Amino acid sequence: MPTQSKHASINIGLIQAREALMTQFRPILNQANITDQQWRIIRLLAENGTLDFQDLANQACILRPSLTGILTRLEKAGLVVRLKPSNDQRRVYLKLTSEGEKLYEEIGEEVDERYDAIEEVLGREKMLLLKDLLAELAKIEDALNS
């Protein structure tokens, strides 16, 4: 009889939960002809203004080589612009264009409506608890290495 780690199901559960959530959002993103990763970038830039490349990669959970290609496609679509400060050519900052902001507003409304529907099912208290627990779990590496 196979043995199973008592904690192995946490990773699987997180992946399954993400996939269940994405079934609510993929149709919205598909209609706008953007990917999940592109939406994460657009959302982060809309919520933070200008971000540097490294910060965007970290916050979006996208590896830097992959981010480069995604940003190139978003630039070609006229949604994102790269900015290089004159005092440090090694750094790259990213910002939404007005078209990118417009797309965020359009999609953001539908995304918020889906989150509201999810909250109706789970309840506000559980949604807040889930958000807090996920934020805590995201910082686990720091907690274990200190």
From Swiss-Prot:
GO terms for molecular function: DNA binding; DNA-binding transcription factor activity. Transmembrane segments: none annotated. Residues 7-139 form the HTH marR-type domain. InterPro entries: HpaR/FarR (IPR012712), HTH_MarR-typ (IPR000835), MarR/SlyA-like (IPR039422), Tscrpt_reg_MarR-type_CS (IPR023187), WH-like_DNA-bd_sf (IPR036388), WH_DNA-bd_sf (IPR036390). Induction: Repressed by the HTH-type transcriptional regulator MtrR. Negatively autoregulated. It comes from the Bacteria. Keywords: DNA-binding, Repressor, Transcription, Transcription regulation. Coiled coil: none annotated. Residues 53-76 bind DNA. The keyword Repressor applies. One of its GO terms (biological process) is negative regulation of DNA-templated transcription. Signal peptide: none annotated. PANTHER family: 4-HYDROXYPHENYLACETATE CATABOLISM PROTEIN, TRANSCRIPTIONAL REGULATOR, MARR FAMILY. Negatively controls expression of the farAB operon by binding directly to the farAB promoter region. Binds to three sites (sites A, B and C) within the DNA sequence upstream of farA. Also represses its own expression. This is HTH-type transcriptional regulator FarR.
